[in-house]
Amino acid sequence: MKSTFHEKDSRATTILERIHTDVCGPFSVASTTKNRYYVIFVNDFSRKCWILFMQKKSKTFSNFCEFKALVEKESRKQVKALRSDNGGEFISGEFKYFCSAEGIQRELIAPHNPQQNGVAERKNRMIVSAARVMLHFRAFPYTCGLRHATLRFMCKTVVLIEYFT
């Protein structure tokens, strides 16, 4: 039985104090670069988000490493906490070791309680909904789906990073 969740988390007081993350996909139609997934990283303080497209969920760890290097270089601050679900891509030994070595506190949400990671879940819902609307009205080809929806609707608060590997 699903438990109820009432506790409200305090919001971060500085950038990179807490990052929310989630993987979305697979999508039935791949992008022009064969990507069927994306991983989203949301800064709890500013709500700015970064989206990295990927062909396989197994790229989540390497994408996190690249994201971390990018934001820490830009901000000159360290990622302090990472909130994610208990998906296999986030609980691998490699991921645990990296976070431990870098001093990143892991906040793994309870199974079957996505509301505990509501920040990332809401961003995912907004992006996917925008893509569906644009596809419905034929605003762009199916293969451009999420990438174009993200660019059009969230360009002020989203940073897209698409790797052509």
Identify the function of each model-found stretch.
Residues 1-165:
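Anionic group-binding determinants
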